[in-house]
Amino acid sequence: QQHYGFSPFAFSICFAVNAVAIGVAATISVKFRQLETGTLTGCIGMLCLSVCVMIALYNGCGFWTYELLMFALLFTMGLTFTSSTTLAMDSERRYAGAASALLGALCFASGGIVSPLVGLGNILVSTGVTFVVCAICSLLCALWAMRKVPMKVAMCRIFR
């Protein structure tokens, strides 16, 4: 908001537009024949677009470039919301309530961890790097959950 010189009201309009991207993608994600495909597509899209956002922010992109990339990034993120939650709840139906609580707590904990990280150093660069790291973690977790990559391999890739 401050970097691009927008008022709080103008920037809240941008948030609303981005929220539409998430909502539309969440609606579309149920159209995939397999829920895993929606999650994997979203995670791969998040990684690709996070790298684009990081490069754009590093190069001091204009607002419209930033907004278009964020809209696309949040769209791909929205693809993962419905399918990943459904897959998590379906994996252990007996413990769906506990799984839901853990997912909610994980989201809040992740937000608490990430929030101070984006303020380190140059806020544009740290934000871009944080997006990429979170996208990598999301993709590795999705691959591990789908059993396409053993947990040991996924963890090694995260901490490499």
PLM regions: where:
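A late C-terminal transmembrane helix in Major Facilitator Superfamily
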Residues: 75, 87-123, 130-131
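Intrinsic disorder in cytosolic terminal tails and internal cytosolic loops
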Residues: 143-160
